[in-house]
Amino acid sequence: MTDVKKSIRANRGTELECLGWEQEAVLRMLRNNLDPEVAEKPEDLIVYGGIGKAARDWDAFHAIEHSLKTLKNDETLLVQSGKPVGMFRTHPQAPRVLLANSVLVPKWADWEHFHELEKKGLMMYGQMTAGSWIYIGSQGILQGTYETFAELARQHFGGSLKGTLTLTAGLGGMGGAQPLSVTMNEGVVIAVEVDEKRIDKRIETKYCDRKTASIEEALAWAEEAKLAGKPLSIALLGNAAEVHHTLLNRGVKIDIVTDQTSAHDPLIGYVPEGYSLDEADRLRQDTPELYVRLAKQSMKKHVEAMLAFQQKGSIVFDYGNNIRQVAKDEGLENAFDFPGFVPAYIRPLFCEGKGPFRWAALSGDPADIYRTDALLKELFPTNKALHRWIDMAQEKVTFQGLPSRICWLGYGERKKMGLAINELVRTGELKAPVVIGRDHLDCGSVASPNRETEAMKDGSDAVGDWAVLNALVNTAAGASWVSFHHGGGVGMGYSLHAGMVAVADGSELADERLARVLTSDPGMGIIRHADAGYERAVEVAKEQDIIVPMQK
């Protein structure tokens, strides 16, 4: 299996293995998801987020590869939970691939039924960008995490986290962005992580500065940095359910508390207190029911600590892993006393159609990304926050796999950037085509009552129609591949979400498709929030001449 792991890497350059650049882009991004620089456990096809996979099994992976190599420019490949199940003739402007991952009928939409199907080889968990083949490593969530802490700093600390201490946990593919996001905002952070390999990966990619297994050493480093007003990120090896209570008992002053452990998956994602990783693995294999019970009890204890910090004056927020829900199910009635990050910090951006816009250079040449960085500044010369982000990303972000970039852009801006990238491909300034996509966490693509759609103004938190409409409109608009998933971020039964990717290959046809997709996709966010009664979304719809039939 080690040999297989080493062999998975996206091709670079302009030589094609497939019959067209769209198919080639899909193949390269599928492989990029499993690049050892990118994936958490590539030998098991796991990309990030507990058991978020790129393909159902190795046979399915190789079948997908073969299908993409033979897929014609007027055909569409269908992928059901990581397994290729059909190829049909469609037309050149249709998506080359349509994917559905871990979608269960609501009455059966829980982890127990999912695991039954998974054991039978009938389903896989796609997370968000794992099964939709547009994961780019921790950078993929970095700016969203950075923007969250930046908005928190604006609301509570005068615009900077300098001199503050943040406590969090979880340094996996998503949580790994937290340390760098805090230090980019000039703060100090202690991030608790039970798996030392994950810590080492974050330090190796420069997302985290230091590591220790000693609470005393972590606190000493943190205090020194705070007093000096210097940013510092510290990974503390330990279990959050234990460490947080130790810090409480010692009376340590924490300014900000959040969490990004894989609490969405109690069986695979969260390690119960009192167990080493090896002991946890054995317990998981031998008595999974006991494991889940102990993990949920630890999560309850973890949330109790977060609530206690809140009582002591810390700013506490949930970072979308559903840990509050688990704690409430375990009998902690006030588990939702602290808010989720979307209603607290991100929703105003969603109302303007802003969200995570990412792209990857299929050439494999970092110079292509640096040229697009310059392009961003050329297109948006007055957006100083965007310029600052690009400068920091160039300085601090290590590319994982194919060189890539992410930034948050709004309605109109995404189309402008996409068409400009396509022009650079056409003129040869970029050495090969570029894929343009996003996280499923976006303004108009998710229904997730404990995360993206928490506390909607009109009470429409659980309405899943919007995520379905997003997938449908991106298919109609001509995205290169479109995905619809269940359970990403917060686990089975708690979310529905859609993703899209479009390929800028320099052609006039790509111009047409990019213009449609990069308009309708963020436009979904505006109409979704306008429909829910958000005044800013209504204003933006009017400003941008977006037709919302029943909107006054």
From Swiss-Prot:
Its main location: cytoplasm. The active site is at C407. Gene3D superfamilies: Urocanase like domains (3.40.50.10730), Urocanase superfamily (3.40.1770.10). Catalyzes the conversion of urocanate to 4-imidazolone-5-propionate. Binds 1 NAD(+) per subunit. Composed of at least two subunits. Pfam families: Urocanase, Urocanase_C, Urocanase_N. NAD(+) binds at residues 49-50, 127, 173-175, 193, 198, 239-240, 260-264, 270-271, 319, 489. InterPro entries: Urocanase, Urocanase-like, Urocanase_C, Urocanase_central_sf, Urocanase_CS, Urocanase_N, Urocanase_Rossmann-like, Urocanase_sf. The lineage of its organism: Bacteria, Bacillati, Bacillota, Bacilli, Bacillales. It catalyses: 4-imidazolone-5-propanoate = trans-urocanate + H2O. This is Urocanate hydratase.
